[in-house]
Amino acid sequence: MRPKLRSYLAWLPVLLLVVPVILWPGYSMAIQELIPRLSLDLTYDDNILFSRRSPQRDWIYEVRPSLSWRYRTERDILDVMAGLHGQKYNTEHDLDTLDQDYRLYASREVFFGTTISLNARYILDTTLDEEFTEEGLLLSRQERHVYSLEPAVQWQATERSTWAFSAPVYHVNYEGDKNQDYSTEYLTLSYSYLLDDEKTSLFAQPSVGFIDFEYGDTKVYEMMFGVGREFTERLFAKLMAGLSYTRSHIDERFEPIGPFSIKVQDEEDYSKTGWVGAGELKWDWDRGQWNMNFVRRVSASGYGETLIRDRLTTEASWRITERIHFKGRLSIGQVKSQSDKTLRSYYYDYDDYVTYDVSPAIVYQLTERIDVQAYYRYSLIDYKEVSDTRHRNRFFIRLDYRDVWFGQ
């Protein structure tokens, strides 16, 4: 990791303490919310390690307590959240975990039309579940530490045009040596313009990114244009597309296999040009809603190289009765190496694969604050270059409590 980034991350705990004080609102009418939440899960998993050769089954007892505090004034927003996720396996006790999640979001309108903000987060979790859900990537099961920091500024230049600038920093550290740590730094400029019809907006977004791996680095340059339209009060669509250009360097690498060391990676320099894009569709109904998102982007990964990731995600909910509603999620993704060479390691064979993930659920509202939920989740990974297909079925029963306490 570069010294500059090390220094940046070292200041993260300080920023988490100092920024709320700097952005603390002056005297004005404020709305505060304290939100406690507790979820209790009983889960059956028929392939806890997502293995093809020897799937293991187990029952898992899960508890998720969290506490959020929200502060609002006309000029200021301050959100703080702390959450835990404990998992206790019925037989595989060495897989027991206690995940942690801490978040901070603060923003202030410093003068008319200009808002500064900071988004920070620290996560401790495991790769096998969380990284697959978030990124569609299958990595060896290890603890994952994630540090993210995103300062931003937004300027409402006119009634129709808005400029925004952000500089997100992201660092991932994996326990052990099966996955490779990486860091990313991006600079992103966004511009939007609302047309005279008051429903259609045009977008432009250039960005430059720097990715550091343990055995290489990548520079990413992207330019995207797009259009968004609010067809009705309930239907909105947005589509962005553009070009990306990357320059990558990969170091020569060896891995120990018993008493020997074998070369698993040649030194390589290469550049790639391709297209990137993002789209979203939101549709609200009287008794539910439907959202769909698509993204194609150049992405860092725990494999130690950049990937091209395509992912389509759709979510729907439907209220059947006053107390019962259905919700579901479907995600389809493809992961492909940017390198011309098939980079394989002792742990991975990951050059090209497709993932499918579907999770329907029924939710019953016991009381105003308590829900009972029944989930099913099916996951599939299909490797294109080798004969390897992996399946995973999970069943969940969840008791969910959520309350909101108000104050001024």
Residue positions per predicted region:
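Intrinsic disorder/low-complexity segments
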Residues: 1-4, 22-25
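Bacterial N-terminal signal peptides that target proteins for export
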Residues: 2-13
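Bacterial N-terminal signal peptides
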Residues: 11-24
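Gram-negative and organellar
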Residues: 29-408
